[in-house]
């Protein structure tokens, strides 16, 4: 009886950790763009991997999904988008390669790990003004955590 509850707790902890990692990477990219007075790119890799680089230049920081979030899955909106670029004012600008800009990341775990009903999916949203926010897509409207 305790084992399934523990599995649910661990899976949801991975969701929270991966969500926080995505949020932190996006905030890092935004802050570095402002600090460096340059364009900085947040690039999402596979799973919850990401890399922050100065556009056309040096890597600022990289995070691997093996850092505690191996089971987490991240769905990107729009589909196929892989990066977002911040300008020196912390706003979103067009990616240098012309690719679509990430506007939303939905973090979950596979239903083979825990049921969808037990999963506490999280979302990271990015506005054109550069604001990054985490929210719960399943929370009731009007609550502080609702998207």
Q: Language model features by range: what are they?
A:
Residues 1-31, 35, 39-147:
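N-terminal helix-rich module
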């Amino acid at each position: 009886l305790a084992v399934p509850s523990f599995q649910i707790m661990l899976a949801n902890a991975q969701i929270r950790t991966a969500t926080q990692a995505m949020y932190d990477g996006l905030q890092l990219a935004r802050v570095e763009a402002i600090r460096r007075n340059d364009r900085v790119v947040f690039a999402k890799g596979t799973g919850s991997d990401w890399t922050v680089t100065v556009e056309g230049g040096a890597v600022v920081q990289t995070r691997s999904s093996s850092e505690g979030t191996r089971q987490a899955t991240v769905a990107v909106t729009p589909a196929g988008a892989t990066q977002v670029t911040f300008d020196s004012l912390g706003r979103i600008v067009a990616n240098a390669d012309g690719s679509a800009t990430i506007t939303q990341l939905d973090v979950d775990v596979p239903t083979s790990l825990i049921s969808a009903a037990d999963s506490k999916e999280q979302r990271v949203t990015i506005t054109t003004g550069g604001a990054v926010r985490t929210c719960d897509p399943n929370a009731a409207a009007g609550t502080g955590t609702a998207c």
